[in-house]
């Protein structure tokens, strides 16, 4: 320690370089319990150029500890350095002799002899006891003593470091100070702060001068009150619009901006930029882009023709018709109406032809009746008189029946009607144009309190297209009329006849018919004498027939001929004004034909139909040509003709696979 201090006070040429760092090249180990003291000492040692190690080794120069044993390190070194007594030196003098006893005896000589008389073993024991009491084995201090490390107490180390610092300061003061000249003057350190609006700031672009700023409590307005535009703006504006503009012009600070600045802001807000995916182009204004030729060409092209066709089928419910006053409409709507104008005319013509053809097939001199069916009212047409001036009853057009009638039926030329007649119905399923087991008929039932009248009729078979006939056709029968009167009006005497059937009626009722034969067909006019006092009357007095040879020429091979005799139950007390009608479509199930029916005589068949008291209704036979009535004056010939027709009904049927579909 003294040598080091001496070197600092009397420095040589080599040590002058290490004046600022006297602890350079020296290693320290700190054995301290206090963490604060160790951190402070470590900081001072590093400032003086020393290093601090965390592990004790032989390379450490100084050991700084806080233990009390470090204060008596010098005595420990002295004890360890005292040599042990050698017993060989006293070997010659061990034996007592009378010469030694004769030495002069003094007071001090006796004490010295006691110390010298201590044996070697006792001295080693004493030494070991002292070492164990002061320094335990394998401790930091014992290892440092054995390795030759210098041990310092904390207090001594602090005083030593303070002396080094003071000597260092004296050396720095004695040396001349060299001032470093800087190019730029030192700036004054100012803490950064955030400027609060409103403020003014002037800043140098080269950053050589500090910026100048001024924070104001209220910003002064520099805008002029006059407008920037050359053209004067109309001062007549709504009060609400002015209030909205003043609210928008108020800044966060509370001051009001001029209206000219607000106009610029509004123009910027109105410009809406976007991108058109159709044209693949950006636009600044949507309205100007829509009116551009590029966008118009794309919109008028056929890219979305399929979508336009689908939209055109929808109803225009979303159009605001209040905008189109006095019948004015947009161009697009007018184009749609022109586009589908031709289709609408065709549909109207088809529906007119359909209703006319069905009306002709069902017209008879009947009284007018009002339809109560909601579906029938939309399809009904005004009645047309045939054979007399009585009002007619119109048959409603079934669903989808517009395609069944040809436009040529609307003409009055009989030759065209016969040439374009529709295929008639037949009985066999394998023939084209037939309905098979399906048969259209009309049932007429009227119910009273005590008595019942059942009128069954055989409806004329109208020529239909079998592929287009709907399954839910509703047939209507008027009131106050007997069932047979739908096709013919007969007087009991037979001397009053109406005019001949019209061409349309004949063609629709009897299928393909020769015009020459139609001249021979006549019908009676009225049915007022149908109900007699007896209450029962057969149908043979009502149905006129055609000659047998003419009938055979008109009938095809597959359809039956002749008329069916049925019994009508009537009552004299029946009020025809209160009758109600029930109309429906009846589907008949085919019945296999029996072989024994062919052998039944005509009288038995006639008796079977006349004696039947069952209330079930017979709907007739489905054929193309049935019931060709004509006027006959002789009653006997009329009965004979009916018998022949009954036989002809079964004469055209065969037993090989054909089925009887009548009942």
Curated annotation (Swiss-Prot):
Keyword Protease listed: no
InterPro entries: BRCT_dom, BRCT_dom_sf, Replication_Regulatory_Kinase, Znf_DBF, Znf_DBF_sf
Region of interest (Disordered), residue spans: 84-119, 171-193
Modification(s) after translation: Phosphorylated.
Intracellular or extracellular location(s): Nucleus
Source organism of the structure: Xenopus tropicalis (Western clawed frog)
UniProt feature, compositional bias: Polar residues: 87-99
Protein's recorded name: Protein DBF4 homolog A
């Amino acid at each position: 320690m003294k040598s080091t201090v001496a070197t600092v006070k009397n420095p040589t040429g080599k040590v002058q370089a290490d004046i600022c760092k006297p602890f350079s090249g020296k290693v320290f180990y700190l054995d301290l319990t206090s963490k604060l003291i160790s951190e402070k000492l470590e900081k001072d040692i590093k400032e003086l150029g020393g290093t601090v190690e965390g592990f004790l080794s032989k390379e450490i120069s100084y050991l700084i500890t806080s233990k009390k044993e470090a204060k008596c390190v010098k005595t420990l070194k002295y004890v360890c350095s005292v040599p042990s007594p050698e017993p060989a030196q006293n070997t010659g003098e061990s034996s007592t002799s009378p010469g030694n006893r004769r030495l002069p005896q003094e007071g001090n000589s006796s004490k010295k002899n006691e110390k010298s008389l201590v044996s070697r073993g006792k001295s080693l024991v004493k030494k070991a006891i002292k070492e164990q009491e002061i320094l335990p084995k394998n401790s930091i201090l014992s290892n440092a003593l054995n390795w030759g490390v210098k041990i310092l107490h904390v207090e001594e180390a602090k005083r030593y470091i303070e002396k080094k610092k003071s000597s260092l300061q004296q050396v720095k003061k004695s040396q001349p100070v060299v001032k470093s000249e800087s190019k730029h003057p030192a700036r004054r350190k100012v803490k950064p702060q955030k400027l609060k609006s409103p403020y003014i700031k002037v800043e140098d672009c080269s950053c050589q001068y500090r910026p100048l700023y001024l924070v104001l409590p209220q910003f002064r307005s520099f805008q002029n009150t006059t407008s920037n535009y050359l053209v004067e703006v109309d001062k007549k504006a709504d009060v609400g619009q002015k209030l909205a503009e003043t609210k928008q012009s108020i800044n966060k600070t509370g001051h009001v901006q001029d209206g000219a600045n607000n106009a610029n802001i509004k123009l910027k807000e109105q410009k809406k930029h976007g991108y058109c995916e159709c044209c693949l182009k950006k636009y600044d204004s949507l309205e100007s882009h829509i009116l551009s030729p590029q966008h118009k060409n794309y919109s008028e092209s056929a890219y979305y023709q399929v979508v336009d066709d689908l939209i055109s089928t929808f109803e225009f419910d979303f159009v605001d018709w209040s905008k189109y006053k006095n019948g004015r409409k947009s161009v697009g709507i007018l184009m749609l109406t022109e586009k589908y104008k031709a289709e609408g005319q065709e549909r109207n013509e088809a529906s007119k032809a359909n209703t006319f053809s069905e009306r002709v097939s069902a017209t008879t001199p009947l009284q007018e009746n009002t339809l109560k069916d909601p579906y029938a009212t939309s399809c009904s047409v005004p009645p047309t008189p045939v054979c007399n001036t009585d009002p007619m009853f119109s048959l409603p057009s079934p669903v989808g029946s517009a395609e069944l009638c040809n436009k040529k039926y609307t003409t009055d030329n009989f030759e065209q009607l016969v040439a374009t007649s529709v295929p008639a119905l037949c009985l066999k399923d394998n023939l084209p144009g037939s309905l098979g087991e399906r048969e259209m008929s009309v049932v007429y039932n009227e119910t009273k309190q005590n008595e019942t009248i059942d009128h069954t009729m055989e409806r004329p078979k109208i020529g239909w297209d079998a592929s287009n006939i709907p399954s839910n056709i509703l047939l209507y029968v008027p009131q106050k009329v007997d069932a047979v009167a739908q096709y013919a009006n007969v007087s009991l005497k037979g001397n009053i006849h109406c005019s001949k059937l019209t061409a349309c009626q004949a063609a629709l009722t009897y299928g393909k018919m020769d015009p020459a034969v139609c001249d021979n067909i006549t019908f009676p006019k009225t049915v007022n004498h149908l109900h007699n006092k007896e209450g029962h009357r057969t149908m043979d007095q009502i149905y006129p027939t055609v000659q047998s040879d003419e009938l055979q020429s008109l009938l095809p091979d597959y359809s039956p001929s002749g008329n069916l005799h049925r019994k009508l139950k009537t009552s004299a007390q029946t009020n025809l004004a209160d009758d109600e009608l029930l109309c429906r479509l009846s589907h008949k199930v085919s019945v296999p034909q029996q072989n024994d029916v062919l052998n039944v005589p005509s009288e038995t068949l006639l008796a079977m139909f006349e004696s039947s008291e069952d209330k079930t209704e017979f709907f007739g036979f489905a054929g193309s040509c049935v019931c060709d009535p004509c006027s006959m004056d002789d009653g006997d010939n009329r009965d004979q003709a009916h018998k022949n027709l009954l036989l002809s009904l079964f004469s055209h049927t065969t037993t090989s696979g054909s089925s009887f579909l009548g009942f």
